[in-house]
């Protein structure tokens, strides 16, 4: 009996062991065996301070000796751990080839638990532990997480398993897990056909899946996991976006790039009028002297264009960026950042959306008390918000910078842009920082974020939109 089958014999579909948590001997009596390893490393000197290990037979190891650890692992086939590939194994073995298959619970967690609430044992990229600086305890938690991951893998459809295996077998962060569960790619059906069938109606039918799979296999796997969530507030962890920034590009290609020939997904989910009715209850956009300025601006934003829009006062300009923001909040779990000059205007827009039952908007400004500010920041970080209103001065805040780096920002909107269209005594120099911030953001994340600039115009001759 394989290790995989023995594990499944003791784990039910929800991830709970059918025997006691510490009794795992029933599936470890054959030649296949495994151990969990955790290494504590000094923050300053980057040297190993402590080593802990937990073997399949419940034997434990806890001392700072690599030689003794190797003896402890002498009959092991799989060495498991949380971030073991790029942390523990590097400090223990360096770049030397090991005979063990490394099973990393870190990289599988967002793939198998992409939806809120996320796995209880994982926060960001860290494993939640009961004790500080106790590597044996960390091994126990990693074992619990791995068992849950295996149980969830078993619950996936055979087609989904083939998709993930086809994308990830041979990639060191995932290969050990794939070996442990005996995953196999499907040789009978093409990967493109499998993905199109598994995610029918959730992605563009004409997306170039083949190219994405060849160039970005890991990013495609994470993107597909997120796409399958039912809670749009679920977001890709910041550490995944840091290591695989292509996730944002891939999910946009699958979910928010309108195909030329049209398909069921694009014709409905990316249609401006359908979503206007869905979110705001309107049957049509406003027109000005017969010209559909509002619809033109909204459609340009939905299609991923940077644009300049000039509207008469009271012309409904806010809807031209709110509607695309709500659409992208659902399609790519994205965040739109609205830079507005007045805190009262920010509050009015958030309140007006809330009156319509739309709770996706939040503002962070200096008028908030510490508790309200903390709650607002948490809503942005957690994915509750798809619209964030801030002043230009807030872009200099390290807190704002941190939370924006952790989210998939799809667009920056400069609202009430007439505030910096001319010099004057009350000119706010922080408006000059907006361009620098956006450029640095794009460079650090390796993405192209779109921009909308919205002006008030006093006369109809000034009203219109331009694409940039």
Locate predicted features.
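N-terminal accessory regions of nucleic-acid-interacting proteins
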Residues: 1-32, 104
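Conserved pre-motif I regulatory segment
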Residues: 262-310
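Conserved DEDDh/DEDDy metal-dependent 3′-5′ exonuclease domain
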Residues: 45, 52-128, 135-153
């Amino acid at each position: 009996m394989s290790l995989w089958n023995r594990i499944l014999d003791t784990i039910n579909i929800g991830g709970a062991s059918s025997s006691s948590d510490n009794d795992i001997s029933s599936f470890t009596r054959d030649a296949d065996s495994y151990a969990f390893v955790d290494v504590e490393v000094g923050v300053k000197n980057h040297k190993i301070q402590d080593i802990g290990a937990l073997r399949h037979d419940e034997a434990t190891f806890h001392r700072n000796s690599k030689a003794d650890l190797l003896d402890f692992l002498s009959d092991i086939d799989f060495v498991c751990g949380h971030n073991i590939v790029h942390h523990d194994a590097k400090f223990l073995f360096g770049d030397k080839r090991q005979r063990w298959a490394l099973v990393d619970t870190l990289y599988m967690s967002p793939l198998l638990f992409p939806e809120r609430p996320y796995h209880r044992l994982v926060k960001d990229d860290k494993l939640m532990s009961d004790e500080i600086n106790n590597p044996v305890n960390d091994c126990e938690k990693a074992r619990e997480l791995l068992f849950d991951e295996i149980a969830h893998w078993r619950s996936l459809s055979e087609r989904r398993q083939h998709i993930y295996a086809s994308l990830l077998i041979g990639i060191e962060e995932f290969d050990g897990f794939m070996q442990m569960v005996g995953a196999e790619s499907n040789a009978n059906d093409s990967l493109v056909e499998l993905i199109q069938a598994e995610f029918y109606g959730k992605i563009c039918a004409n997306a170039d899946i083949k190219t994405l799979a060849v160039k970005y296999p890991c990013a495609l796997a994470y993107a597909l996991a997120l796409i399958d969530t039912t809670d749009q507030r679920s977001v890709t962890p910041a550490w995944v976006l840091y290591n695989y920034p292509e996730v944002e590009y891939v999910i946009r290609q699958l979910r928010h790039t309108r195909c030329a020939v049209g398909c069921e997904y694009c014709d409905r989910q990316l249609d401006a009028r359908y979503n206007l009715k869905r979110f705001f209850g309107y049957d049509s956009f406003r027109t000005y002297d017969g010209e559909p300025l509002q619809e033109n601006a909204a459609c340009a934003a939905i299609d991923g264009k940077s644009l300049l829009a000039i509207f008469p006062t009271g012309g409904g300009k806010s809807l031209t960026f709110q509607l695309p923001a709500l659409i992208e909040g659902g399609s790519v779990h994205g965040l739109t950042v609205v830079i507005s000059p007045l805190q009262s205007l920010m509050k009015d827009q958030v309140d007006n959306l809330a009156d319509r039952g739309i709770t996706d908007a939040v503002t962070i400004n200096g008028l908030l008390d510490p508790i309200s500010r903390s709650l607002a920041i948490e809503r942005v970080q957690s994915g509750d918000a798809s619209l964030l209103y801030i002043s230009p001065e807030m872009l200099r805040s390290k807190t704002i910078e941190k939370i924006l780096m952790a989210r998939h920002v799809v667009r920056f909107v400069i609202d009430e842009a007439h505030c910096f269209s001319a010099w004057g005594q009350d000119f706010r120099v922080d408006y000059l920082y907006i361009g620098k911030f956006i450029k640095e953001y794009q460079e650090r994340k390796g993405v192209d974020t779109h921009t909308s600039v919205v002006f008030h115009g006093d006369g109809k001759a000034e009203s219109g939109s331009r694409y940039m």
